[in-house]
C-alpha cells in the first residue's frame, strides 16, 4: 500500500508539473513551456525514467509514447530543437513580413503524426508574431496514434491558441495515418487554405507506405494547399520527402528538399546541464491548388 501511494503521488506530481508547463506556454510562449518541462524532468523523472530505459521502451522515441513521464522525457530531449527547426522553416517559406491588416481567412491545419503538436505550436507562434489573426478561423486536425500524447497536444494547442485572437477549433484523431486516411478522408471543411504539417514522420517506414494514398487524399481537398515537412538528416527522411514531392501533381516548390540547421538552447539529459547546440534537419515546402469536383464537371461540360 505504501508503494502504491508513493507511485500515485509521483504520478500526480508529474501531472501538476505538466499543467504548470502548459500554463507557462499560454502566458509566455514555447521557451518558457520547454523550461518548465525540463523542470518536471529534473524534479524526479530522471530517476524513475533514465534515458536508457526511455530509449528501450520507445525504440528511441520511434514508437507511440504510453505515459506522461515519457512525454516529459521526449520534450526535454527533442522538443526545443524540433520547435526551433519547424519555426525556422515556416518563417523561411511564409516570409517575415508583418501583416497587420485584419483580413478574414479560414485555414485548415492538419498535423500528421502530431506527437505533442510541436509543428502546430510553431505555426501558432509564427502567426502570433507576424499575422493579424483577429478575423481568422483556424481548424486544427491532430492525428496521433498515442492517446497520452494526443491529449497533451490538444491541451497545448488550446493554451497556445489563446495567445492569438483567432477563432480556433481542435479535432483530435487517435489514429495512425493509415486509419485516418481510410476512415476520415472527408473531414476537412471548406477553407481558404489547408496546411499539411509533417514533423519528424516522413522517415517512418509505415508512413512512407501510405504516401500514395496520402497524395490521393491531399489532391482531394478543395482549394489552396500548402505542405511543410521537416525531419532529421536521415537517409529514410530524404527518401520520404522526395517520395511525397514526386507523388504530388502540379505543385509549386516553395522550398525544395534541402539541409539546414538552427541553434537551440537545450537541456542535456546525459550531462545534466544546459547547452547551446546546432540542430540539423531537412526541409521541404510545396504549394498547389485543387479544383473542386463541381468546377471540374462544369469545365468538362
Please describe what each predicted stretch is.
Residues 60-100:
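Class I SAM-dependent methyltransferase Rossmann-like catalytic core
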